[in-house]
């Protein structure tokens, strides 16, 4: 189960809800991110267009994205809207929901291993990561790449550290992206092949220093394809620019003709 630091949501919050009961005047839903807290979805907030049957839009058991429109702390009631959620809000929420589910799954497994409750997992791990880094999932991704200091710096108790590090690698994979360029390198010098190797070797050194993977291969001389692979698209763009600038400079020194092939 997913737990939230706050006991109830705030107005305007976008949430995942599960439809529980449908009536002629609306539907009762549970809020998945608030320990299945109950909320009411009025008929008037289900669709912006006229519908004859409420079940044409929602069905029991289905998960929907809703916006909180009223919170009465005194009465303990919450009203939500389906129609006030934009397509962009829905898309972003569903993406976030997938991440929340991964965090929940990891905490469920690890808490069982160390004889803790899942709620303790949220309190001692997820909430601390949220306080320190803003997002628990992103912090776990960071821990995969940078190590357990990410967890320790957030104040996660030692008992969680090792089993968490063992488990997150099984559930969280960094999305790797690739940036490619095609260049031509020509030399009429008898030592031309060595000169071209020197030029391309400098490109490899730049990529390795930036901690990104690089592959260079011929696609039919004098054309060469340069692929760099990493997890940060902005960094890849910066590294590729540096590589091309460096190739241009060394090619000039070695009297190698260099061009970038426009794709």
From Swiss-Prot:
Keywords: Initiation factor, Protein biosynthesis, RNA-binding. SUPFAM superfamilies: eIF-2-alpha, C-terminal domain, eIF2alpha middle domain-like, Nucleic acid-binding proteins. Gene3D superfamilies: EIF_2_alpha (3.30.70.1130), Nucleic acid-binding proteins (2.40.50.140), Translation initiation factor 2, subunit 1, domain 2 (1.10.150.190). InterPro entries: NA-bd_OB-fold, S1_domain, S1_IF2_alpha, TIF2_asu_arc, TIF2_asu_C, TIF2_asu_middle_sf, TIF_2_asu. Residues 12-83 form the S1 motif domain. One of its GO terms (molecular function) is translation initiation factor activity. Belongs to the eIF-2-alpha family. eIF-2 functions in the early steps of protein synthesis by forming a ternary complex with GTP and initiator tRNA. This is Translation initiation factor 2 subunit alpha. It comes from Sulfurisphaera tokodaii (strain DSM 16993 / JCM 10545 / NBRC 100140 / 7) (Sulfolobus tokodaii).
């Amino acid at each position: 189960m997913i737990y939230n630091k706050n006991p109830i949501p705030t107005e305007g919050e976008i949430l995942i809800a599960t439809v529980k009961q449908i009536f002629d005047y609306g539907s009762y839903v549970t809020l998945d991110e608030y320990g299945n807290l109950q909320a009411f979805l009025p008929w008037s907030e289900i669709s912006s267009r006229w519908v004859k049957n409420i079940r044409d839009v929602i069905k029991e058991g289905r998960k929907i994205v809703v916006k909180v429109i009223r919170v009465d702390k005194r009465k303990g009631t919450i009203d939500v809207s389906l129609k006030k959620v934009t397509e962009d809000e829905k898309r972003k929420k569903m993406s976030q929901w997938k991440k929340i589910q991964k965090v929940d799954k990891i905490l469920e497994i690890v808490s069982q291993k160390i004889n803790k409750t899942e709620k303790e997992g949220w309190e001692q791990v997820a909430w601390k990561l949220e306080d320190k880094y803003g997002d628990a999932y992103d912090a776990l991704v960071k821990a995969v790449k940078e190590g357990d200091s990410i967890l320790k710096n957030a104040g996660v108790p030692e008992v969680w550290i090792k089993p968490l590090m063992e488990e997150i690698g099984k559930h969280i994979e960094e999305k790797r992206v690739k940036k490619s360029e095609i260049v031509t390198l020509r030399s009429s010098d008898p030592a031309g092949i060595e000169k071209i190797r020197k030029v391309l070797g400098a490109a490899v050194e730049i990529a390795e220093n930036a901690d990104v993977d690089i592959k260079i291969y011929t696609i039919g001389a004098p054309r060469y394809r340069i692929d760099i692979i990493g997890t940060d698209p902005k960094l890849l763009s910066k590294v590729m620019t540096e590589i091309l600038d460096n190739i241009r400079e060394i090619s000039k020194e070695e009297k190698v003709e260099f061009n970038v092939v426009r794709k």
